[in-house]
Amino acid sequence: MKIRVPATSANLGPGFDSCGIALSAYLTINVLGESEFWEIQHTLGEEISTNEENLLIQTALKIAPELTPKVIRMVSDIPLARGLGSSSSVIVAGIELANRLAHLNLSPKEKVRLATEMEGHPDNVAPAILGDFVVASHVENQVYHVKHHFPMCDVIAFIPEEPLFTEKSRAVLPEKLAYKEAVAASSIANVMIAAILNGDLPLAGKMMEQDKWHETYRRSLVPHLKEIRRLTQQKGAYGSFLSGAGPTVLILSPEERTNEIVQSLEKLSTKASIQIFNIDQEGVQVF
């Protein structure tokens, strides 16, 4: 059995802790057979556990404690600690692993609820499960979500060499916003979502760059965002935003502008990689 989970990008600027998209980079796990102990085979680095302490197994055992140990191969081309949903992909894979091995027949809604409870917010896990563009809310232990088609475009990722861990990126956020500022932030997010639903990426991109919830406070941690935004605006991008907690910046681009934008970004920094993604429309898949 093979389980594949897409990378994700949360927030899209003003859709803080609510909006997310699935991307065409993947975590893949293969169940190879029975074993006396849980064993995870991977080449992802020493910091990733190879036994039952791995987040994949921890997640699966929370859902189905009776699971018997397996040998599992884990492969991922999702960069770690770069704001592309690497940990969320493992949680989603763990839920699907338990679902299949224990024959739980979980619905997509149940998977989103379980993943949100474990992750704390739905903006990454929901698109990882459902694919495409998802707007979600986690209020009073209830999870509400809507999936919709995201307009066609290229998604260019500017991925710095240095990681930025979510805990550090969240620590700079304020505990409160002034009421007037919160109203403005909410209205910007509303217009962004409506523009996406209408297929209007030029307007959606403008709203993505007007966020008031988090990007302002994270600028000191992601100094490259301002220059990327200036450069990509000049080259005809729809818009750019900090992916999740950063440090990756995503740029939405018309296909005909992508090569020129990528060339400009490559000149900007040698301490970053540039990748081009598509929107993954399927979410978690089992083969």
Curated annotation (Swiss-Prot):
Enzyme Commission number(s): 2.7.1.39
Gene of this entry: thrB
Q: What is the lineage of its organism?
A: Bacteria, Bacillati, Bacillota, Bacilli, Lactobacillales
Question: What keyword terms does UniProt attach to this protein?
Answer: Amino-acid biosynthesis, ATP-binding, Cytoplasm, Kinase, Nucleotide-binding, Threonine biosynthesis, Transferase
Name residues in a coiled coil: none
What compartments host this protein? Cytoplasm
Q: Which reaction does it catalyse?
A: L-homoserine + ATP = O-phospho-L-homoserine + ADP + H(+)
Q: Which Gene3D superfamilies match?
A: 3.30.230.10, GHMP kinase, C-terminal domain (3.30.70.890)
The entry's protein name is Homoserine kinase
Q: Which family does it belong to?
A: Belongs to the GHMP kinase family. Homoserine kinase subfamily.
